[in-house]
Amino acid sequence: MNSVRVRVPATSANLGPGFDSLGVALRLYNTTTVVRGRGPALGDMAREAADLFFGKTQTKPFSFHWSVEGDVPRSRGLGSSVTVRLGVLHGLNELAGRPLKRHRVFELCAELEGHPDNAAPGAFGGFCIAPAKGPVQSYVVGEDLAFVFLIPAHELETEKARNLLPKTLPLSDAVLSAGNAAAIAGAFASGDYKKLAGCFGDRIHQPYRAKVLPFLDSVIEAGCAAGALGGWLSGAGSAVACATLARPDRVANAMASACDLDTACAIVLRADNQGVRILK
């Protein structure tokens, strides 16, 4: 085998209070092609993935080049970096004869990301609970639950968004967020999505990131007024998400109307329950 194509879904992480630990895979994809042989410079992300892969597997390094295409926008909080890292790692794994199982490839991706909340749903699909230590729990998400995203044209780099966060939190903020994250996990695990209503409130990261995303609260409020169960900042942003069981188009229109950015677009997605796929 000299080339392989790997499809990875977009992901939305945190879901409000589940900071660095909750995420869901979406039916929006990037496809990475990895080809044996010399080509253009790899770039930092692919080179770091390759160094980690060859180092961990002790596979004899080989030259390769790669490309990515698809619909996942960069630096909007939809896991674009995971689509590249998982794509390159799985591509190398296939070309090397599959020395790693899927879960181990996920672990390498999470190591490169620095947190597992996007890497887990990208790898396994569905809704994922991904603790810093311990096994990933993945749950199939039903077709009745829609995810509506308002995606601004401007990017927000994850590193910049993390620099906005405080070093410590009031105990009351941590308790509220932990309780809401547990409720979200329970609702997805049981499939009783009505119980998501009112559970997306967060005091760990969203209040601080809202300083550079002034439309965040108004967009979520508009989505909820139109019937959504709740909303959150997708990953580090800049996209904003709402979950709904009814009239997603109405929710999308409300979210778009509440945003004063002329270049933002609203889309409706369902969950991807497969995760990464080797297309070859």
Where are each of the predicted segments found?
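Gly/Ser-rich oxyanion-binding loop with an adjacent helix/lid
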Residues: 61-137
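Active-site rim beta-loop-alpha module in soluble metabolic enzymes
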Residues: 149-211
